[in-house]
């Protein structure tokens, strides 16, 4: 009996020590998980580093495609400084940039797939440059019409954060399904990627719950040329199967002058102070499309320079509503 008490006490001590150890480990794991959740769930703001957005776990491997992959982004650059990696652009709205990355993060965290590859692993292995392509999905209503938005960047880089993501987000708010394409810089490769994107969406429309009938192609600067070229020449010209032409092409600030006679209905807008895309060239382009009997429209905004995006707070504010109305008016007239 004398031995029972010490043994019992020792056993209790071991149990208590083990339990405490488990509690300590549990508390440590809880603390670590809390820290991870705090990092993952915290909202971005104007002072958030761009590299922190890119590396956020919510975005996985595609976070790098949120910003131009063709430029080295300094680690100290913040969201409020994004204009420093967007040459040729103006009227960059920090509040919109913050809204965009927060919206995309929230959707990704909720389990929504917001990014889609357009090339297979085998295709990307054969051509590593195809790794830097894909579609960001700004989901609207299930079964709603589809817009594909292409940012510019002079075929040197892709300015999606200012020239396609904001437009796609606004279209999704109005119920439309909008995709922002990240493509390989270069006129030919960019058009090949857009043709592939159209093919991908046509082939996966059912599972994506989108309507590709009467789809539209949108673009700014170089992205506008892509939209116009695919609209006029078609997907087969750029290596894909022959899919229907868009119901409308929506172009911003590009000095394209070539008219083939196969252009879809086209809306354009540009500023009078654009030193890259002459508004007179765009006026002439639209006039020639109209002369061919195709519906076309242009808005010219006094004093605006190149790359004004949504044009919030400028004389161009609201142009996207006019473009949307133009698209809607031309639905049902696909070639």
Where are these regions (language model features)?
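Short amphipathic alpha-helix adjacent to the substrate-entry channel of hydrolases
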Residues: 160-179
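Short beta-strand element of the alpha/beta-hydrolase
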Residues: 144-153
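Primarily recognizes the serine-hydrolase "nucleophile elbow" in alpha/beta-hydrolase
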Residues: 192, 196-263
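Conserved alpha/beta-hydrolase "acid-adjacent" motif
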Residues: 275-284
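Short beta-strand/loop motif that positions the catalytic acidic residue
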Residues: 268-270, 274
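C-terminal catalytic histidine-bearing segment of alpha/beta-hydrolase fold enzymes
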Residues: 32-63, 292-335
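A short loop-to-beta-strand scaffold at the N-terminal edge of the catalytic core in hydrolase folds
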Residues: 125-139, 145-146
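N-terminal targeting or regulatory segments adjacent to alpha/beta-hydrolase or S9 domains
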Residues: 6, 14, 19-132
């Amino acid at each position: 009996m004398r031995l029972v008490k010490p043994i019992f006490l020792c056993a209790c001590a071991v149990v208590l020590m083990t339990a405490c150890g488990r509690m300590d480990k549990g508390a440590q794991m809880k603390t670590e998980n809390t820290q991870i959740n705090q990092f993952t769930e915290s909202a971005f703001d104007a002072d958030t580093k761009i590299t922190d957005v890119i590396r956020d776990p919510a975005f996985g491997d595609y976070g790098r495609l949120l910003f131009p992959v063709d430029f080295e982004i300094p680690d100290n650059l913040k969201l409020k400084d994004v204009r420093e990696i967007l040459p040729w652009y103006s009227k960059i709205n920090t509040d919109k940039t913050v809204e965009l990355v927060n919206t995309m993060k929230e959707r990704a965290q909720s389990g929504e797939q917001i990014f889609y590859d357009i090339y297979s692993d085998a295709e990307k292995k054969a051509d590593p440059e195809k790794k830097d392509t894909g579609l960001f999905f700004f989901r609207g209503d299930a079964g709603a019409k589809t817009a594909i938005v292409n940012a510019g960047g002079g075929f040197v880089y892709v300015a999606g954060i200012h020239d396609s993501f904001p437009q796609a987000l606004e279209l999704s708010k109005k119920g439309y399904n909008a995709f922002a394409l990240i493509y390989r810089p270069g006129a030919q490769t960019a058009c090949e990627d857009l043709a592939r994107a159209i093919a991908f969406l046509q082939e996966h429309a059912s599972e994506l719950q989108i309507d590709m009938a009467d789809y539209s192609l949108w673009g700014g600067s170089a992205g506008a040329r892509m939209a116009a070229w695919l609209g006029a020449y078609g997907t087969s010209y750029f290596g894909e199967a022959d899919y229907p032409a868009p119901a409308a092409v929506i172009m911003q600030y590009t000095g394209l002058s070539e008219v083939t006679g196969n252009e879809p209905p086209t809306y354009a807008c540009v500023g009078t102070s654009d030193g890259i895309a002459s508004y007179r060239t765009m006026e002439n382009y639209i006039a020639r499309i109209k002369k061919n009997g195709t519906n076309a429209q242009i808005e010219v905004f006094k004093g605006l320079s190149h790359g004004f995006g949504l044009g919030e707070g400028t004389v161009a504010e609201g142009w996207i509503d006019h473009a949307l109305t133009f698209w809607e008016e031309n639905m049902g007239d696909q070639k």
